[in-house]
């Protein structure tokens, strides 16, 4: 559990939303911005999800590792691929686009100034210019909010990953009387 004093009224929310509930005005703006990467589809949602999860792995961010985006799941991303993610360098089941983006994402997290021209060119070749801009912006979100979760000790999702990832809107069932 986070060390922050979380409002009791948020007990039914996932850990990330509970922490962000301390500043609801920021949460709405952030969620709207972060969701654009998944809805605009300038980058394949499977590639985005693999990179989001790899960033979280590298930073040791428990919450981001415990959730999955519905877009990536709908696009066919399976848990077996996610389980292989920490060893992607040594595996042949990651395609050229995924490999270029994962290489770039790792370097972004570890030392952004160390991204080589060749690594950037591989991403531009795979995603195009607009896709590359969207990808780098998404990496900034993934990196920043993975670090946010680490700093505030946001725990993993209680349901083992069935929740949506940060940026996806909550689908709440209609309540009786409303």
Task: Please report, for each region that a protein language model flagged, where it lies by residue.
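Conserved alpha-helical segments that form or flank metal/cofactor-binding pockets of metalloenzymes
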Residues: 52-82
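Transmembrane-helix boundary/entry motifs in multi-pass membrane transporters
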Residues: 128-129
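Carboxylate-rich helix-loop segments that flank metal/cofactor sites and access channels
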Residues: 77-94
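Short alpha-helical scaffolding segments that buttress acidic/His motifs in well-ordered protein cores
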Residues: 34, 50-55, 85-89, 101-109, ...
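Charged, amphipathic alpha-helical coiled-coil/dimerization segments
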Residues: 113-121
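Mobile cap/lid helix-loop segments that border enzyme active or cofactor-binding sites
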Residues: 1-49, 69-73, 166-178
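Alpha-helical transmembrane segments and membrane-interface helix-loop junctions
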Residues: 94, 119, 156-159, 163-175
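A ubiquitous short alpha-helical element
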Residues: 14-22, 88-93, 103-108
